[in-house]
Regions:
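Bacterial N-terminal signal peptides that target proteins for export
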Residues: 2-12
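Bacterial N-terminal signal peptides
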Residues: 12-21
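A short beta-strand-turn-helix
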Residues: 26-39, 81
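Short pre-active-site segment immediately N-terminal to redox-active cysteine/selenocysteine motifs
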Residues: 37-40, 44-48, 91
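Conserved redox-active cysteine motifs that mediate thiol-disulfide chemistry
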Residues: 44-58
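Thiol-based oxidoreductase modules, predominantly thioredoxin-like and allied folds used
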Residues: 63, 68-81
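Structural micro-motif
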Residues: 88-96
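Non-catalytic, surface beta->alpha helical segment in thiol-disulfide oxidoreductase systems
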Residues: 99-127
């Protein structure tokens, strides 16, 4: 197979994966955190960290549930170490919640259960 066709196939495959929902859009290209005018949850972790992997399906579900009401953002700090410094990260995963004005209002370190995340998002008015 000639190279140009191979590259076209690879690009098409990548776009199909991104468009399929396997990688939520806010994770594929993370917006500026916090997202202006929205309750924002940023989860700082790594794709290879075990508790982070346990949280991934929870965050994917909540990203769909709260779409348009809250921004759910994942940042892999092993791939982007400057982000760890920016957020004064001590452990992964860490979840940081921002109100609609962009003020950090809550920080949790370690695995966070879905019901606990929902409670914070709802308290901030994302429901």
């Amino acid at each position: 197979m000639p190279m140009p066709h191979r590259n076209t196939i690879l690009i098409g495959l990548a776009l199909a994966v991104l468009g399929s929902g396997l990688i939520p859009p806010t994770w594929a290209a993370a917006p500026q955190v916090p997202v202006k005018g929205m309750v924002t949850l940023v989860d700082l972790g790594a794709n290879s960290c075990i508790p982070c992997k346990m949280m991934a399906p929870i965050l994917e579900k909540l990203e769909k549930v709260y779409r348009g009401k809250a921004a759910i953002v994942f940042i892999d700090v092993w791939k982007t170490p400057d982000e760890a410094k920016r957020f004064n990260l001590q452990v992964i995963p860490t979840q940081i919640f921002y109100d609609k004005k962009g003020k950090e209002v809550y920080r949790h370190m370690g695995f966070m259960a879905e019901k606990d995340i929902v409670a914070v998002l709802d308290k901030l008015g994302a429901n």
